[in-house]
């Protein structure tokens, strides 16, 4: 059959083609054209002419016809890709529609149960009030307990641990309970805000309400086959960053083709102030009659029966209630995943101030349930080739770097004895904990690599601390630490860490309050689909490693992982972890991670909650305090800091002294940063002193005198002092005052709320900020050129420009007005600025 292509050939001089008819190509001609198309889909005019000369079989076809053939071929290819994309989207929507219909059925059952329970409780209350006047409330309590018995803890007789049939009985019970949670109404699920279903969304995410322990549930669609999904999810350390290890102690095949495993799972503690957790569980994997594959898991206890698991003094035994994942195949490929995590983390063993962290289903959802679903979706995208990373590295290699950074940081925070960590005597202060590790066995089999000790000396020293911060936005704090390293880091300490990668690291530096400024350049490597985590290389350049090499300036490199910075995430933690690397950046490069972790604590309305006396303070010291205040208006978070350094035997004490002082300096820097970025409600920060009222009156009156206009409109003339002050304080434009002295650099003396937000400071710290440090070069030149006019005419308008906040962030503004503020005696008091429509760049 002859291949053909449509085109109008009325203008063709070739009589071999009929005008207005289809131009037909022989199979040989099509094959020749396809070969060229595979090499170059859009050949130039010269290339098309060359093609006709090189291929005799195309000699009877005009160049214009060849051009049209390539145009149509590109169009068909585009249509084919679009058709395939639409078919994929249609399959996703069909699967998601099926998922939503099932979720709707489950919700209808849940509503029916709630209606029945509501009627039952009303009947019991009515019966109790009509038949007795007993004030013991026993009958009411009994009815109230009906709701609490949604998730009863079944008491099972002690089973023979050596009989596989008894373990299968436990497994089948676990499976039934898990399926009721995953697709039924065994748990009262509440959908998390911001989690909306769709073809490209993470899926449906819900958390538990009124059940024992904490629980989270997620369901979503991925383009992987069920068995591949099961393989990924069973490898918990690959996607759950807090998982230290999963050890399978026994594997028992079942008669129905399934598998029973006895598993010991160890979980890192997120902070330095609580012990790590472990689980002793039975894990059951099997196929269902409808073709689905399920992996469910539950703790083995005296209540459930089963063998006893290994115990470790470094871990607190937590309880896993029936959990797991259900994987169902989709028509046309892919899978629908239902994931349930239900645990009891034994909050009684946790300091009270940290208990919200262990009682939050939202945190569980983000750290485990959603993390699992995101990881599977990430693998699916990489498998399909939709994710492209720069630098020539495979996605799996970059994921391994991220895992090693997190694992190394978690090892440092936890400092397990069986890893070789041991505490070092303190200097009398309890704020910084120093631990050392000289175990060669530890490093030989760890993420550091077998060459760790030869490269890094005799061992590793870790300095760590935890702090309680109040009313500090976690994302803002982590972003600042990432973007403004020079504000908290010491260049000499960074250089020492980087020099540990060399054969002869130089002497231990003395910590300075302010190190050399360094040029920080962030080079992105990879990021996850939802952009909640990204891996990057940070280049710090400009200085020598040692005083002896001052002439040999050398760049330093850090491999850095920033996670949890998605503003739409509810209940998640954010962290910044980094490790020095050399220029080669090999795939097996040894990593010694340090960094920060910020975990928000849910707000509590219990007046007995322990509170910190100041905005930022050491968390450990607050545990023994007795100050108790209402925390309804306070948001709290825990900041954990850990820095690791290498040492030789002769330098251990010096490194410990340096590390302790360095971490204390970092803590002090973070306290200053936290003070500056803490949101301040305008009504609570509004200054109401007589001096403030007088200054505002001078500012507005001077503006009116010099410009002939009113600062806040015509109505402001009749306003009283308090009203005028509130208008200035709440004004959207930044209004600032600075000193007017000829013998000293001008400093800011007053600012409204917008001005404080723009400068990222407070009224107290404002007076330490100089005007010339805030304006950029063009702004300073513009002000100097207009200064004489300001002093003579009273005001001047400046063009749009850039200024810098106290945190080093650039701020743009569309226009600035500067005027001279005079007091009641017509004497010059200060200069006032209004920066219109300012925003962070």
Curated annotation (Swiss-Prot):
Gene Ontology MF term list: DNA binding; DNA-binding transcription factor activity; lipid binding; transcription cis-regulatory region binding
Region Disordered: start-end pairs: 1-21, 140-162, 602-630
Effect of residue 75 to A: Decrease in DNA-binding efficiency
Subunit structure: Binds DNA as homodimer. Interacts with ESR1 and ESR2. Interacts with ZPR3.
DNA-binding region: 18-81
Induction record: By auxin. Repressed by miR165 and miR166.
Protein species of origin: Arabidopsis thaliana (Mouse-ear cress)
A GO biological-process term: primary shoot apical meristem specification
Coiled coil (UniProt feature): 85-118
Domain called START: residue spans: 160-388
Protein name, as recorded: Homeobox-leucine zipper protein ATHB-9
């Amino acid at each position: 059959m002859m291949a053909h292509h449509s085109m109008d050939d009325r203008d063709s001089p070739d009589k071999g083609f009929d005008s207005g008819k289809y131009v037909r190509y022989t199979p040989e001609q099509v094959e020749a054209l396809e070969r060229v198309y595979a090499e170059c889909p859009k050949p130039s005019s010269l290339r098309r002419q060359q093609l006709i000369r090189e291929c005799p079989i195309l000699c009877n076809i005009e160049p214009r016809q060849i051009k049209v053939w390539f145009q149509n071929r590109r169009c068909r290819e585009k249509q084919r890709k679009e058709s395939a994309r639409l078919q994929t989207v249609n399959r996703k929507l069909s699967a998601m529609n099926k998922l939503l219909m099932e979720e709707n059925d489950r919700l209808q059952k849940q509503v029916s149960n709630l209606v029945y329970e509501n009627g039952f409780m009303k009947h019991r209350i009515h019966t109790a009030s009509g038949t007795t006047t007993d004030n013991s409330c026993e009958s009411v309590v009994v009815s109230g307990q009906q709701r609490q018995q949604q998730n009863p803890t079944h008491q099972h007789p002690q089973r023979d641990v050596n009989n596989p049939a008894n373990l299968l009985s436990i497994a089948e019970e676990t499976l039934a309970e898990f399926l009721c949670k995953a697709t039924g109404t065994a748990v009262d699920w509440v959908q998390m805000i911001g989690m909306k279903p769709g073809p490209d969304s993470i899926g449906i995410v819900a958390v538990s309400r009124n059940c024992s322990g904490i629980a989270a549930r997620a369901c979503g669609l991925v383009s992987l086959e069920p068995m591949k999904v099961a393989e990924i999810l069973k490898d918990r350390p690959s996607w759950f960053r807090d998982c230290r290890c999963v050890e399978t102690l026994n594997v028992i095949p079942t008669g129905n083709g399934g598998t029973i495993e006895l598993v010991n799972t160890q979980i890192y503690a997120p902070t330095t102030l609580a012990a790590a957790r472990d689980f002793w569980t039975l894990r059951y994997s099997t196929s269902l009659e409808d073709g689905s594959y399920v992996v469910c898991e539950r703790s083995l206890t005296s209540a459930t029966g089963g063998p006893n698991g290994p115990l470790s003094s470094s871990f607190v035994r937590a309880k896993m209630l029936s959990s797991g994942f259900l994987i169902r195949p989709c028509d046309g490929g892919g899978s629908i995943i239902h994931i349930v995590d239900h645990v009891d983390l034994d909050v009684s063993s946790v300091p009270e101030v940290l208990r919200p962290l262990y009682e939050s289903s939202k945190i569980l959802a983000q750290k485990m349930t959603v993390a699992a679903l995101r990881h599977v979706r990430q693998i699916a995208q990489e498998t399909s080739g939709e994710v492209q990373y720069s630098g020539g590295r495979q996605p799996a290699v970059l994921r391994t770097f991220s895992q090693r950074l997190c694992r190394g940081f978690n090892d440092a925070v936890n400092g397990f004895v069986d890893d070789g960590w041991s505490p070092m005597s303190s200097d009398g202060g309890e704020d910084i904990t120093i631990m050392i590790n000289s175990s060669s066995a530890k490093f030989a089999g760890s993420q550091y690599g077998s060459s760790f000790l030869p490269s890094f000396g005799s061992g590793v020293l870790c300095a760590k601390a935890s702090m309680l911060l109040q009313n500090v936005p976690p994302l803002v704090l982590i972003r600042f630490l990432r973007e403004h390293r020079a504000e908290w880091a010491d260049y000499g300490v960074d250089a020492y860490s980087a020099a540990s990668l060399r054969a002869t690291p130089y002497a231990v530096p003395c910590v300075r309050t302010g190190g050399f400024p360094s040029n920080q350049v962030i080079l992105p490597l990879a990021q996850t689909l939802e952009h909640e985590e990204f891996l990057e290389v940070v280049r710090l350049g400009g200085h020598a490693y040692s005083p002896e090499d001052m002439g040999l300036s050398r760049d330093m490199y850090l491999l850095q992982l920033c996670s949890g910075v998605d503003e739409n995430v509810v209940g998640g933690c954010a962290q910044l972890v980094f490790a020095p690397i050399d220029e080669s950046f090999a795939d097996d490069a040894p990593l010694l991670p340090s960094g920060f972790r910020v975990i928000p604590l849910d707000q509590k309305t219990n007046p007995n909650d322990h509170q910190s006396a100041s905005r930022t303070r050491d968390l450990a010291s607050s545990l023994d305090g007795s100050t108790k205040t209402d925390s309804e208006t306070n948001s709290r978070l825990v900041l954990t800091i850990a820095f690791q350094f290498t040492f030789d035997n002769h330098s251990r004490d010096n490194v410990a002294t340096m590390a302790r002082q360095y971490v204390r300096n970092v803590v002090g820097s973070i306290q200053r940063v936290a003070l500056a970025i803490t949101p301040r409600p305008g009504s609570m920060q509004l200054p109401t002193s007589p001096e403030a009222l007088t200054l505002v009156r001078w500012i507005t009156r001077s503006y009116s005198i010099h410009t002939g206009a009113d600062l806040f409109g015509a109505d402001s003339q009749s306003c009283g002092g308090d009203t005028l002050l509130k208008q200035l304080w709440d004004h959207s434009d930044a209004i600032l005052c600075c000193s007017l002295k000829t013998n000293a650099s001008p400093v800011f003396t007053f600012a409204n709320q917008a001005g404080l937000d723009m400068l990222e400071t407070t009224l107290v710290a404002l007076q330490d900020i100089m005007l010339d440090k805030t304006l950029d070069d063009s702004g300073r030149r513009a002000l100097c050129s207009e200064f004489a006019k300001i002093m003579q005419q009273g005001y001047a308008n400046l063009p749009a420009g850039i200024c810098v906040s106290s945190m080093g962030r650039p701020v743009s503004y569309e226009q600035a007005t500067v005027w001279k503020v005079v007091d009641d005696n017509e004497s010059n008091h200060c200069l006032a600025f209004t920066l219109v429509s300012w925003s962070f760049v």
